[in-house]
């Protein structure tokens, strides 16, 4: 079955359980330490003890003051188009496309997406996890849980733990910015966080090659081709969306 945990990685029975964390459930289903995978019944095919230091280096901020194993290269930058592709918390897409210039977004009015300004209150997940502190650009507030598991943006919070729990600052003179980073800084203003572990960058990780969600998606796609009105399409799609904290 799909993996459901609270914010500490402790298994819960489902998405309606007290303490359920869509962000942590999704993050741990994708990749983490083997010692933290005991609750993951979703894995079908995987590799143990993968030397993932380079992958984690690419995804970890180059934060001034952190020691080597907790300081990355800020190399794998997510694009704005990738960021725009994530839903809002209400399940709506923030934009419906781009204007003729290919850059200016066309705001989806049903999404409650706000492009300009900064937040005046903390934005937290249903499990109490801080997603966006005060002063975060509004375009990163009120997004779906997977966004906060997959994307590191300026003013986002890095994982708790040794040399963690800090607020990421990608501005030019910020703690993770270009001035102190020399060549190791994000060129897009974002980092990919997906598949990143919460510990140091030299830990060996489980590489999940096939998980139950992939099987569900393959089943959904097959039905869409041969029986597009089959009720299982939305049964399994909504199962996946609910685990991710997205309305069905």
Where are these regions (language model features)?
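Acidic/polar-rich alpha-helix caps and helix-coil junctions
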Residues: 1-80, 86-248
């Amino acid at each position: 079955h799909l993996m459901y945990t609270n914010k500490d990685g402790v298994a819960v029975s489902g998405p309606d359980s007290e303490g359920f964390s869509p962000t942590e459930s999704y993050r741990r289903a994708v990749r983490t330490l083997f010692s933290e995978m005991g609750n993951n019944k979703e894995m079908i095919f995987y590799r143990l003890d993968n030397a993932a230091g380079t992958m984690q280096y690419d995804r970890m901020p180059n934060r001034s003051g952190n020691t080597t194993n907790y300081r990355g290269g800020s190399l794998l930058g997510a694009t704005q188009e990738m960021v725009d592709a994530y839903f809002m918390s209400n399940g709506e897409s923030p934009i419906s496309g781009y204007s003729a210039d290919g850059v200016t977004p066309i705001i989806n009015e049903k999404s409650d997406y706000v492009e300009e300004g900064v937040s005046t209150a903390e934005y937290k997940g249903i499990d109490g996890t801080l997603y966006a502190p005060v002063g975060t650009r509004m375009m990163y507030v009120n997004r779906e849980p997977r966004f906060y598991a997959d994307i590191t943006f300026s003013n986002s919070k890095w994982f708790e733990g040794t040399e963690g729990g800090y607020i990421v600052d990608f501005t030019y003179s910020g703690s993770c910015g270009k001035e102190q980073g020399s060549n190791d800084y994000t060129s897009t203003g974002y980092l990919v966080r997906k598949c990143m572990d919460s510990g140091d960058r030299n830990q060996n990780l489980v590489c999940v090659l096939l998980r139950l969600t992939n099987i569900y998606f393959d089943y959904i796609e097959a039905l869409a081709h041969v029986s597009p009105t089959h009720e299982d399409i939305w049964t399994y799609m909504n199962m996946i969306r609910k685990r991710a904290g997205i309305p069905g």
